[in-house]
Regions:
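Short acidic/polar hinge/loop motifs at secondary-structure boundaries
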Residues: 77, 108-109, 116, 121-147
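Flexible loop and strand-edge segments within Gram-negative outer membrane beta-barrel domains
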Residues: 245, 249-294, 356-360, 386, ...
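Outer-membrane beta-barrel translocator domains and adjoining extracellular loop/strand segments
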Residues: 131, 209, 214-222, 259-265, ...
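Extracytoplasmic beta-strand/coil segments of soluble accessory domains associated
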Residues: 43, 79-123
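Transmembrane beta-barrel wall of Gram-negative outer-membrane proteins
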Residues: 173-175, 180-211, 215-260, 295, ...
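Non-catalytic regulatory/gating segments with a bias toward low-complexity or hydrophobic composition
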Residues: 58, 66, 78, 141-146, ...
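N-terminal Sec signal peptide and the immediately downstream disordered periplasmic leader
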Residues: 1-69, 75-81, 193, 242, ...
Length: 436
């Protein structure tokens, strides 16, 4: 039985960091003579290869490197990978803004796909919502820079962040971690593995994060909640034969994030708010709050033969996202021009609070079939077929009511052939055809 329990407490992080820095440096010097070069194996081309043999700009991060580098979230990957900048969007809960080689997209709008793709367990996220996630339960992380349309079902111009989570082990095991800090911060997460007869296993996972804002609200004389996040998941693996297996996973999540706004009162009509006197304080009574609630389902079926592998991946994402802000009804808002070209405006009721909501419902369903060779000879290839259906519905109000529906139906065929000319040179040729 594999049992691991970890407790962490984050108090006075600056002092602790200064105290431990000399110890860390000393440990590195002591290990310098005994540490050698370790071969890094990546799966950028759907097969296990040495990173030196892959003609792709890829950075691979192991779970050990994540732990040693204190990389706990997908937002932290930019600390270890060059040419990568990651941060959470200004609005939206658990929505990521990813930039690779200067190509980025920083919005929660679903009608525009992000320039940097994120794939979790082989499923491409058609939106950047949900791109902020914990790295507690990962087997490997690879960051590929540049277009990857010949290797992945969904193409992106900036690159791909490819994350593979651990599969059920089929044995009893547990991994727990608890973190506490100031501003009432708490983070509890864990994984429980159990056998499923002698043919597979079950994995249960959970995570709960709560914390108050670092900004003190002078109107409420208190700190309001900043983040309240809860995620629960289950994964079932079944081995039909020695060479054929299936993994079915389901995740349910509920996130809430509150932004401590400091809004200039002259920002726009209908937006009454006070400007903060100090960046650590805010007088705003009703700040912007974002909610993200949904569920993900993934099915992966793999068949391994002597010199090839066939894999089928299905992914379903269904979630709702709400951005809400309360405003003070003063002034007016513009309606545009009338038929004579005269500006038209509508007055608001002075002294009335009203909420401005931006609701989005999003659902995507994807199917991908991959065929990957593993020949002993100089030639190998990867080929696949990819299908994606995604639709989003957005509504907003009450000041300016509007609705919009966006739909994507995409089918693609992709592939890449590599040939080793000799021990030094190799040739790789890829192609892709997409109908959308």
């Amino acid at each position: 039985m594999n049992y691991q329990k970890t407790y962490k407490k984050q108090l006075l992080p600056a002092i602790i960091s200064l105290c431990t820095l000399p110890l860390y440096a000393g440990g590195a010097i002591a290990q310098e003579e005994s540490v050698g070069l370790e071969e890094i194996v990546v799966t950028a081309r759907k097969r296990q290869e040495s990173i030196q043999d892959v003609p792709v700009a890829v950075s691979a991060i192991s779970p050990g490197q994540l732990e040693r580098g204190s990389i706990t979230s997908s937002l932290d990957l930019g600390k270890m990978v060059p040419n990568v900048e990651l941060h959470e969007t200004a609005i939206g809960s658990e929505s990521i803004s990813a930039s690779i080689r200067g190509l980025s997209y920083d919005d929660i709008e679903k009608s525009i796909e992000p320039t940097v793709g994120i794939a979790i367990d082989g499923v491409f996220l058609a939106s950047n919502s949900g791109g902020v996630f914990d790295l507690f339960d990962v087997e490997s992380v690879e960051v590929l820079r540049g277009p990857q349309g010949t290797l992945f079902g969904r193409n992106t111009i900036g690159g791909v962040i490819n994350v593979q989570r651990t599969e059920p082990t089929g044995e009893f095991g547990m991994k727990l971690e608890a973190v506490a800090g100031d501003q009432d911060m708490s983070d509890v997460k864990g994984i429980i593995n159990m056998p499923l007869s002698d043919k597979g296993g079950i994995k249960l996972s959970f995570k709960n994060t709560e914390s108050d804002s670092h900004v003190y609200n002078t109107t409420l004389n208190d700190r309001r909640p900043y983040k309240d996040s809860e995620t629960m998941g289950i994964a079932i693996k079944y081995n039909f034969t020695e060479n054929t297996s299936a993994v079915l996973s389901y995740d349910d999540y509920d996130h809430q994030t509150t932004a401590p706004d400091t809004v200039n009162p002259g920002f726009g009509n209908g937006m009454g708010a006070s400007e903060a006197d100090d960046w650590k304080t805010s007088p705003q009574m009703f700040p912007l709050t974002a909610y993200l609630k949904g569920e993900n389902t993934t099915l992966k079926i793999t068949h391994d033969a002597d010199n090839y592998q066939i894999k089928y991946i299905m992914g379903i994402m269904d979630y709702s996202e709400t951005v809400r802000e309360a405003s003070w009804g003063i002034g007016s808002f513009d309606l545009g021009l009338d038929e004579d070209g005269v500006p038209v405006s509508q007055a608001l009721l002075d002294g009335i609070f009203f909420t401005v909501d931006r609701d989005q419902d999003f659902k995507q369903t994807s199917h991908e079939v991959q065929f990957t060779s593993d020949f002993d000879g100089p030639m190998n290839f990867v080929a696949g077929v990819y299908m994606l259906e995604a639709d989003s519905y957005i509504s907003s109000g009450p000041v300016q009511n509007f609705t919009a529906l966006h739909y994507v139906d995409s089918t693609a065929v992709f592939g890449e052939v590599s040939y080793d000319l000799n021990d030094v040179w190799s040739l790789a040729v890829g192609a892709r055809y997409t109908e959308e």
